[in-house]
Amino acid sequence: MTKPIKTEVINTPPHGRFGFVRKFDIHTGFDIYCSDGEPVFAIEDGIVTDISHFTGEYTTPVPTPWWENTMAIAIEGKSGVILYGEIYEPSLRIGDKISEGQHIANVKRVLKNDKGLPMSMLHIELYIHGYRGDWAVWNIEEEKPNELCNIETILSKIYKL
């Protein structure tokens, strides 16, 4: 497995970790804070299964205009479907074969307003094999969506969390 962001230390605060209960929802992924434009690499071999809007005014079912417009790419490999979000539009296409360690995208600044928090991050989620559909929303007081898995099980093998 390859690190998606080439850093030795991840300084992810609790609110950026999988399963953290936020004001309006529960966090569905893991945020790796980094610079705008930071290269993103594939964790494992796979095939591109989706490229879509992730944050901003074009997201569905609920637009998030308080965030910048960002994209996501999903790659299905041996661990399941890994979503890499909060990126610039990638040059890859659905159906492309991806090799572990291949440059797949670049991180895009997601926050519009500086509130003293990191403004750019790679947001990563993990889904069951074969999943195709809308990316999970995990509402407070609801069970974790069945298709959503804890990405930290993979990240803990390649980073110290």
Q: Each predicted region: which residue ranges?
A:
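Short glycine/threonine/proline-enriched tight-turn/helix- or strand-capping micro-motif at secondary-structure
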Residues: 8-44, 51-64, 70
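Short, well-structured beta-strand-loop connectors
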Residues: 39-51, 92-107
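Zn2+-dependent peptidoglycan hydrolase active-site motif and core
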Residues: 43-91, 115-123
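Acidic, glycine-rich catalytic/binding loops that coordinate metals and/or anionic ligands
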Residues: 1-5, 90-102, 109, 117-161
